Swiss-Prot record:
One of its GO terms (molecular function) is metal ion binding. It comes from Trichoplax adhaerens. Its main location: endoplasmic reticulum. GO terms for biological process: intracellular iron ion homeostasis; regulation of autophagy. Keywords: 2Fe-2S, Endoplasmic reticulum, Iron, Iron-sulfur, Membrane, Metal-binding, Transmembrane, Transmembrane helix. Belongs to the CISD protein family. CISD2 subfamily. This is CDGSH iron-sulfur domain-containing protein 2 homolog. Signal peptide: none annotated. Residues 60-140 are cytoplasmic. The chain crosses the membrane at residues 36-59.
Amino acid sequence: MEAIAKLIKVQLPNYLQKLPVPSSLSGFAELSPSDAIAVVFPFAVVSWLIGYSTYKFFQPKAVELPPSPKAKDTNCVNKCIDKTCKKVVHTVDIEDVGEKLVFCRCWRSKKFPYCDGSHNNHNEQEQDNVGPLIVKGKAN
């Protein structure tokens, strides 16, 4: 603690008294290069520290939503589709698309892999924003 007190009470005032600070703005032009560096460098460092501290203080904090109490396992996406399979894969032939197909991405659809709008209920319950995957065929 004595070292900090000595730094603030003795060494810092001595350092500031020795700085060649001009009395006017035109006096900066008359400073030698070494004197200019001795004045500008500490000013730049202190200005940067004040600016960075202000930025960090006012920087918006990330908001994490609490997990929904209705979700049993928040790490599991697929809660009911083909749970006996190691990996659920559905293939759709591109010629079968026709005008448009809407695929489920929330894993809640009763017509999986096609969307039946179940994501709307899921989004309300879980505060999520999941939507369907829409695949359109080429327009002739």
